[in-house]
């Protein structure tokens, strides 16, 4: 099973991109949540605009689905400049990055998603570009090869990554502004759901928006996806208005519970509790019990369960916590 196959996946899905762009906030005043990041960026942007300078290079990191691309677009909009978007895996050759950099206008934003996946060769080209706005590339091969130095207009590089630890130190050190995005509170997600519903023309009661937010795993991308599915349900089974009852019925049909767990999350936890007495149990045994690959469990299923305190990863194996027992209505004593 792939992460993108799950309804509560925080990964981007191509078919949703157009709709996501339609409901994406364009300014910091519309940007809900991440209050510290928002207030800091407002100051940095205002200062840069006063000086008519490019904004310092920005690194945005955090789990998928929290709005790194959205924030990059907001920064460009607030600066009143164009944004050029690309991603680390797409930039394969020196000529690729050279073509992008030489087409930037003064103070423009270059946004590189998944920046941790840039090759060392591309990073080496970026260093002088970021520091001195100079492009140093080799033309030709062998004895005929020669170095060409080009002046670049001042620009801002915004890098986004879900895995900041994979960035090389030289690249990381060249970002003057580093922002970490955190999971959203239920209150913030409720505002996001209500705003998205309004933009999509979906009548939504405040309690209905909150019910969707509660099951969205702290992630706006999931909240907007669930909102669209609840909208479908309410239009077919109800009068098109998303109430708390309608949201609950829709999400129960979709098998997303009050903690945002789907069928696979519950299957994993129940396997640890019922088949292995709560653990500790090895990952290979869990994989065999639920019929999933070891890598899928480690990369897709476990992280959220561990983060929410339902599962512990120990040297002896995985252990279901008392919180997991309570979730399924079991006595925590059974764990011992």
Swiss-Prot record:
Q: Where is this region: Head domain (RuvB-H)?
A: 258-336
Give me the residues that bind DNA, please.
313, 318
Chain residues that bind ATP: 23-24, 65, 68-70, 131-133, 174, 184, 221
Note the superkingdom of the native organism: Bacteria
Q: Which Enzyme Commission numbers does its entry carry?
A: 3.6.4.-
Q: Where is this region: Small ATPAse domain (RuvB-S)?
A: 185-255
Query: Matching InterPro entries, A to Z?
Result: AAA+_ATPase, AAA_lid_4, DNA_helicase_Holl-junc_RuvB, P-loop_NTPase, RuvB-like_N, RuvB_C, WH-like_DNA-bd_sf, WH_DNA-bd_sf
Q: Where in the cell is it found?
A: Cytoplasm
Q: Which residues bind Mg(2+)?
A: 69
| Catalytic activity reported | ATP + H2O = ADP + phosphate + H(+)
UniProt family annotation: Belongs to the RuvB family.
Record remark: domains: Has 3 domains, the large (RuvB-L) and small ATPase (RuvB-S) domains and the C-terminal head (RuvB-H) domain. The head domain binds DNA, while the ATPase domains jointly bind ATP, ADP or are empty depending on the state of the subunit in the translocation cycle. During a single DNA translocation step the structure of each domain remains the same, but their relative positions change.
In terms of HAMAP family, this protein maps to: DNA_HJ_migration_RuvB
The record describes the protein's role as: The RuvA-RuvB-RuvC complex processes Holliday junction (HJ) DNA during genetic recombination and DNA repair, while the RuvA-RuvB complex plays an important role in the rescue of blocked DNA replication forks via replication fork reversal (RFR). RuvA specifically binds to HJ cruciform DNA, conferring on it an open structure. The RuvB hexamer acts as an ATP-dependent pump, pulling dsDNA into and through the RuvAB complex. RuvB forms 2 homohexamers on either side of HJ DNA bound by 1 or 2 RuvA tetramers; 4 subunits per hexamer contact DNA at a time.
Q: How does it assemble?
A: Homohexamer. Forms an RuvA(8)-RuvB(12)-Holliday junction (HJ) complex. HJ DNA is sandwiched between 2 RuvA tetramers; dsDNA enters through RuvA and exits via RuvB. An RuvB hexamer assembles on each DNA strand where it exits the tetramer. Each RuvB hexamer is contacted by two RuvA subunits (via domain III) on 2 adjacent RuvB subunits; this complex drives branch migration. In the full resolvosome a probable DNA-RuvA(4)-RuvB(12)-RuvC(2) complex forms which resolves the HJ.
Looking up NCBIfam families in the UniProt record yields: PRK00080.1, ruvB
Q: What is the name of this protein?
A: Holliday junction branch migration complex subunit RuvB
Organism classification: Bacteria, Pseudomonadati, Pseudomonadota, Gammaproteobacteria, Legionellales
């Amino acid at each position: 099973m792939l992460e993108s196959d799950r309804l509560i996946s925080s990964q981007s899905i191509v078919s949703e991109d157009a709709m996501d762009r339609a409901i994406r906030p364009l300014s910091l005043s519309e940007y809900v949540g991440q209050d510290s990041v928002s207030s800091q960026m407002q100051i940095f942007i205002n200062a840069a605009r006063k000086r008519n300078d490019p904004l310092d290079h920005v690194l945005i990191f955090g789990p998928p689905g929290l709005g790194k691309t959205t924030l990059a677009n907001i920064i460009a909009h607030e600066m009143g400049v164009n944004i050029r978007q690309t991603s680390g895996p797409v930039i394969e050759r020196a000529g690729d990055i050279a073509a992008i950099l030489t087409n930037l206008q003064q103070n423009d934003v270059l946004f590189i998603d998944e920046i941790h996946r840039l090759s060392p060769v591309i990073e080496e080209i970026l260093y002088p570009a970021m520091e001195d706005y100079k492009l140093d590339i080799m033309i030709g091969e062998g004895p005929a090869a020669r170095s060409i130095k080009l002046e670049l207009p001042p620009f801002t590089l915004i890098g986004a990554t879900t895995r900041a630890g994979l960035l090389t130190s030289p690249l990381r050190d060249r970002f003057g502004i580093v922002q970490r995005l955190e999971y959203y509170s239920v209150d913030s997600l409720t505002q996001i759901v209500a705003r998205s519903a309004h933009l999509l023309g979906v009548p939504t009661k405040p309690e209905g928006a909150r019910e969707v937010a509660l099951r969205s795993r702290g992630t706006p991308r999931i909240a907007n996806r669930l909102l669209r599915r609840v909208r479908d349900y309410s239009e077919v089974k109800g009068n098109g208005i998303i109430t708390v009852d309608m949201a609950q019925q829709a999400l129960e049909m979709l098998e997303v519970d009050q903690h945002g767990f789907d069928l696979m999350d519950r299957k994993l936890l129940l396997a640890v509790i019922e088949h292995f007495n709560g653990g500790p149990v090895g990952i290979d045994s869990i994989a065999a019990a639920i019929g999933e690959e070891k890598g899928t469990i480690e990369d897709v299923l476990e992280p959220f369960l561990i983060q929410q305190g339902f599962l512990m990863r120990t040297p002896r194996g995985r252990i279901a916590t008392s919180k997991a027992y309570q979730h399924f209505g079991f006595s925590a004593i059974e764990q011992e």
